[in-house]
């Protein structure tokens, strides 16, 4: 059985994040400045729509959590989930996201319409972890894995937008989350290490899968936008 120590797991999963981001068509093209500015706006508009529904994923973890009174301390896991969700709600993250969209040139985010791939990703966590055969601990591990993508992903975004697209304001949203999401991973994983009976291999695999899902979401959105523009041009 693999260790659940947060540092050891972080090293395993960060290597996974690094490899997937390096293989990503969207992040590779963004880093090189190869994406047209209007397509950059379109991709981040879809990210904004997904981000507006991200808090629901925490709700799935709460619904799937163990009842009070069991041998393991469910309170600690719930406490960490609530702390992370409270930061999502009270940190004016939505306001920062709107400022970022404004810096990209998106004046009216209400006009953005979700692509099917965005809706599918937003609902993927529910489809994967709500079934009775999936444990709440696996859901929390997956959520923690998604959080761990943030620092590396955000570093690519901030560097690329400032270097290739002249975006120098509105980036606080990504700078804030670089540290915040890493803290969320540590807090959630350390709580899991003390409170779970689930095989560590299943937890690490759930985290790996969600990392893959998140990077794939960006690539799927990018591909859908390129395909739509290609059809319009033909």
Give the residues covered by each predicted segment:
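Non-heme di-metal
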Residues: 2-234
